[in-house]
Amino acid sequence: MALSSQIWAACLLLLLLLASLTSGSVFPQQTGQLAELQPQDRAGARASWMPMFQRRRRRDTHFPICIFCCGCCHRSKCGMCCKT
């Protein structure tokens, strides 16, 4: 019984090895196609993020200057100090 389980494990290992070797021969063609598309995708992604970064930059002016909250207002830890 132990011999049959060893044979089964060896066959499974051989099958996995063959599967990994055959999948490696398929991927180089596909990875070459993906490499050709990446520069265009990066440019499109950067263009789509730029308006969001510009909006964030405008909103940053609304953050309070005083980061430390002294607890002078009703909302504790709000980040805005009423005394300054």
Swiss-Prot record:
Disulfide bonds: C66-C82, C69-C72, C70-C78, C73-C81
Function noted in UniProt: Liver-produced hormone that constitutes the main circulating regulator of iron absorption and distribution across tissues. Acts by promoting endocytosis and degradation of ferroportin/SLC40A1, leading to the retention of iron in iron-exporting cells and decreased flow of iron into plasma. Controls the major flows of iron into plasma: absorption of dietary iron in the intestine, recycling of iron by macrophages, which phagocytose old erythrocytes and other cells, and mobilization of stored iron from hepatocytes. Has strong antimicrobial activity against E.coli ML35P N.cinerea and weaker against S.epidermidis, S.aureus and group b streptococcus bacteria. Active against the fungus C.albicans. No activity against P.aeruginosa.
Lineage, uppermost ranks: Eukaryota, Metazoa, Chordata, Craniata, Vertebrata
Inducing stimuli: Expression in hepatocytes is induced by LPS stimulus and the induction is mediated by IL6. Expression is inhibited in presence of TNF.
Coiled coil: none
Protein name per the record: Hepcidin
Disease: Hemochromatosis 2B: A juvenile form of hemochromatosis, a disorder of iron metabolism with excess deposition of iron in a variety of organs leading to their failure, bronze skin pigmentation, hepatic cirrhosis, arthropathy and diabetes. The most common symptoms of juvenile hemochromatosis at presentation are hypogonadism and cardiomyopathy.
Leader peptide range in chain numbering: 1-24
Secreted is among the record's keywords: yes
Subunit note: Interacts with SLC40A1; this interaction promotes SLC40A1 rapid ubiquitination.
Molecular function, one GO term: hormone activity
Entry GO CC: extracellular region; extracellular space
The species this protein was found in: Homo sapiens (Human)
Annotated tissue distribution: Highest expression in liver and to a lesser extent in heart and brain. Low levels in lung, tonsils, salivary gland, trachea, prostate gland, adrenal gland and thyroid gland. Secreted into the urine and blood. Expressed by hepatocytes.
Cellular compartments annotated: Secreted
Keywords: Antibiotic, Antimicrobial, Cleavage on pair of basic residues, Disease variant, Disulfide bond, Fungicide, Hormone, Secreted, Signal
Propeptide: 25-54
